[in-house]
Amino acid sequence: MAIVLDGKSLALKIRQELKQKVEEQEVKPGLVVLLVGEDPASQIYVRNKERAANEVGFHSVVERLPETTTQEELLEKIKTLNEDDAIHGILVQLPLPKQIDSQIVLEAIIPEKDVDGFHLVNLGKLLQKDESIVPCTPKGIIRLLEEYKIDLTGKEMIIIGQSTIVGRPMALLGLNRGATVTVCHSRTKDLEKQIARADIIISAVGKPNLVLREHVKKDAVIIDVGINRLESGKIVGDVDFDGVKDQVSAITPVPGGVGPMTIAMLLEQTYLNACKRENIYE
């Protein structure tokens, strides 16, 4: 039976530690989330982030903007937040309405307040092995692996999905830790063959049953980033959890695996930004 990599418990531990640090340091990290439109999934994600930020003692604000918001209006809002010394982290909830270019918007956030880690400056730093601000989901995956003492050195790591949110930064974090990394995508030939040789499998596609028992080798480690809602209403990942759990050595559940860690890393990066701004050294 596989070890279940419990992201929910680890995220709670990290949040409790952050709350204690905020109280001891008397620093009040400021986090603003910009939500444009009424996307139901985004509403849930933002609500979870707001609740978590308030629990650890942050000054947390969610600015809800109408679906009709123009790119210029959003950029002006970001400009104001960039100049506000009480704000240490700015997050724009994706996806944005079609009239707004998300890349232009993300680049408008100054790198020091880019707690999502999506700014080209921060991604470029990651390329140079500077992990000061890293996309939150890959960072959360690394922390989860470290918590369970899963060493990546010399391991064959297969990442399914090449987004700048998960796949590409995850590949760099894996390389930084001595893994041999292969990134698979929609044009990868014979995906099952690639998966079969992997020691570490990270799937971030959004396709149920993409990874099955017959695809994975014994004692592999699986990180399931996918979130899929079935017609029954059940939330599942990309991996057939019940099918593979007796085959692999460790696996993240969905929900309760990577998702909580993403929020925990968002809070941690906001806190570290606040410490840097206030000249408090961790």
Predicted ranges, named:
Residues V92-L152:
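Anion-binding alpha/beta catalytic cores of soluble intermediary-metabolism enzymes, centered on
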Residues V36-E50, S132-V221, K234-D242:
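Glycine-rich phosphate/diphosphate-binding loop of Rossmann-like nucleotide-binding domains
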Residues A86-L96, D101-I104, R197-L230:
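Glycine-rich phosphate-binding loop
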Residues M1-V27:
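Positively charged, low-complexity intrinsically disordered leader regions
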Residues E73-D85:
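Short, well-structured alpha-helical segments in soluble
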Residues P29-L31, E156-M157:
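Conserved hydrophobic helix-helix packing surfaces used for dimerization/oligomerization
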Residues S102-H119, L123, G226-R277:
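Rossmann-fold NAD(P)-binding glycine/threonine-rich loop
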Residues A53-E67, V181-V183:
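Short beta-strand elements in bilobed, periplasmic/extracellular small-molecule ligand-binding domains
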